[in-house]
Regions:
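Conserved, structured core segments of small domains
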Residues: 1-114
């Protein structure tokens, strides 16, 4: 079964107020339960802000901060299984509704395991 990465595009403007965040977290909990119950859930996780990032380059150079500067960053991800892109997009719509943020859906390459 194909796997897909769902990435949350989070603005750098800060977190919503506590009441809104409580509602979002409740909606995310319901979405994650629905993903688990359907057998589509593989992994999910929220990320710290871009200021916590460290970039390691092939030449050994290590720098603090995100690789790219921008007004948005990846705030969290899901890895899901879905029979096809349409099914993954349906999960993406649910994720966008739960988070109130844009969700990017990308299929993993179909390569043999190492």
């Amino acid at each position: 079964v194909p796997e897909y990465l769902l990435s949350i595009y989070q603005p750098d403007t800060g977190a919503p107020d506590a009441e809104t965040m409580d509602r979002i977290m409740a909606d995310l909990h319901r979405l994650n339960e629905e993903l688990r119950d359907s057998g589509s859930w593989v992994f999910t996780g929220g990320l710290h802000g871009p200021g916590s990032a460290t970039v390691v380059r092939a030449d050994g150079l290590i720098t603090d901060g995100p690789y790219l500067e921008g007004k948005e960053h990846i705030g969290g991800i899901w890895v899901i299984t879905a029979p096809d892109l349409d099914a993954a997009l349906a999960w993406g719509r649910k994720a966008a509704a739960a988070t109130t943020l844009p969700i990017e859906i990308r299929p993993f390459q179909d390569v043999p395991p190492f």
